From Swiss-Prot:
GO molecular function: ribosomal large subunit binding
Record localization: Cytoplasm
Family annotation (Gene3D superfamilies): 3.30.1360.40, Ribosome-recycling factor
Annotated coiled-coil segments of the chain: none
Subcellular location, principal: cytoplasm
One GO term (biological process): translational termination
Function in brief: Responsible for the release of ribosomes from messenger RNA at the termination of protein biosynthesis. May increase the efficiency of translation by recycling ribosomes from one round of translation to another.
Record's protein name: Ribosome-recycling factor
InterPro entries on file: Ribosome_recyc_fac, Ribosome_recyc_fac_dom, RRF_sf
Assigned keywords, A-Z: Cytoplasm, Protein biosynthesis
Higher taxonomy: Bacteria, Bacillati, Cyanobacteriota, Cyanophyceae, Synechococcales
């Protein structure tokens, strides 16, 4: 494993954590809230975005306009079954989601959820570090690297790890601030 490859993998882990954070509801309407919603469409779980157009007419409303009106009920069921805690209303043409202001209790729940997502991101980065260091040690054992080169590469990998974990911590702080700001 080369250093550039390790850095790319760590960057992808940070991006995945960011995407996970985007699916956590903060009290403002945002179509990325619905990214994880899978709708049963002819027996196949299908991403909601593939079945409908999503718009945000104002800061507290999401409109879901299905391309096929027969999917309205399935879309509603998928939203109710999700962990978003939102109640959809259906007028026969569109599904309307009104995002209520977050209660203090719900904010705390979401903060815990976000902290868990951040920890998953950190674990992912640490696993990449472990794989990278194992690769360096293996190359040293095979005689491809000197002991000094190996130590230097391991230090570089640790610096990358620290940098990317710091990025996840910054994303976490930003998201928690977003959750606590009314």
């Amino acid at each position: 494993m080369e250093l550039a490859e390790i850095e790319e993998l760590m960057n992808k882990a940070v991006q995945a954590t960011q995407r996970s954070f985007n699916t956590v509801r903060t009290g403002r309407a945002n179509s990325s809230l619905l990214d994880r919603i899978q709708v049963e469409y002819y027996g196949v779980p299908t991403p909601l975005k593939a079945l409908a157009s999503l718009t945000t007419p104002d800061s507290s409303t999401l409109l879901i306009q299905p391309f096929d009106p027969s999917t309205l009920a399935a879309i509603e069921r998928a939203i109710v079954a999700s962990d978003l805690g939102l109640t959809p209303s259906n007028d026969g043409k569109v599904v309307r989601l009104t995002i209520p202001p977050l209660t203090e209790e719900r904010r705390k729940e979401l903060s815990k959820q976000v902290a868990k997502l951040a920890e998953e991101g950190r674990v992912s980065i640490r696993n990449i570090r472990r794989d990278g260091i194992d690769s360096v040690r293996k190359r040293e054992k095979n005689g491809e690297l000197s002991e000094d080169e190996s130590k230097s590469l391991q230090d570089d990998i640790q610096k990358l790890t620290d940098r990317y974990i710091k990025k996840i911590d910054e994303l976490l702080a930003e998201k928690e601030k977003e959750l606590t700001t009314l």
